[in-house]
């Protein structure tokens, strides 16, 4: 039951799916020249503030991955934590947090990756994944794919299987979706610019 309607009534028709995708797209706010000149920042904060949109994100990605075995949903710091929590609840699975270096206690595995102005390191607690567990990676936005690919390598280094990626937004001109798909990953993006 969702919003007083059985799921198959509310989401069973393409019209409702398109309306809700349109609602999400309309909530995304653009900030030109942020965080620096020449960058168009797509802010998903209004999407995450809207309860209807959060529920729809869960439904949308559930439909894309419902026939896929998932042990955990991994969120990439920080906005990926919101989507991974929504999906973890929807799939009744735990959530893993992929964080910037130095933010997790205990033994961690680290992965270096390139960013616009240099490089950074992300990490995951070593005991988070057992060999051959199936992990869905979630993040708010896919741009060049460097962060997402580094997250996949981190999970694979621990013996996990990356069964797919879920992104609210994909910036197709920056090539991240192409990169991940060429590496053999399943990529699902709700809104593609």
Give a label for each model feature.
Residues 1-193:
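PRPP-associated nucleotide enzymes
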């Amino acid at each position: 039951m969702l919003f007083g309607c059985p799921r198959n009534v509310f989401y069973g028709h393409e019209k409702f799916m398109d309306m809700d995708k349109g609602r999400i797209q309309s909530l995304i706010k653009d900030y030109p020249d942020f965080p620096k000149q020449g960058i168009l920042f797509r802010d998903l904060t209004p999407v995450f503030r809207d309860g209807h949109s959060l529920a729809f994100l869960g439904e949308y990605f559930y439909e894309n991955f419902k026939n896929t075995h998932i042990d955990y949903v991994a969120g990439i710091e920080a906005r990926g934590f919101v989507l991974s929590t929504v999906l973890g609840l929807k799939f009744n699975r735990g959530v893993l947090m992929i964080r910037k270096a130095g933010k997790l206690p205990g033994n961690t595995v680290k992965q270096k990756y390139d960013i616009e102005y240099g490089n950074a390191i992300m990490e995951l607690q070593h005991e988070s994944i057992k060999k051959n567990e199936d992990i869905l990676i979630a993040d708010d936005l896919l741009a060049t794919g460097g962060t997402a690919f580094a997250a996949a390598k981190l999970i694979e280094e621990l013996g996990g299987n990356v069964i797919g990626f879920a992104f609210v937004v994909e910036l197709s001109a920056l090539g991240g979706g192409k990169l991940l798909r060429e590496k053999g990953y399943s990529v699902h993006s709700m809104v593609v610019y």
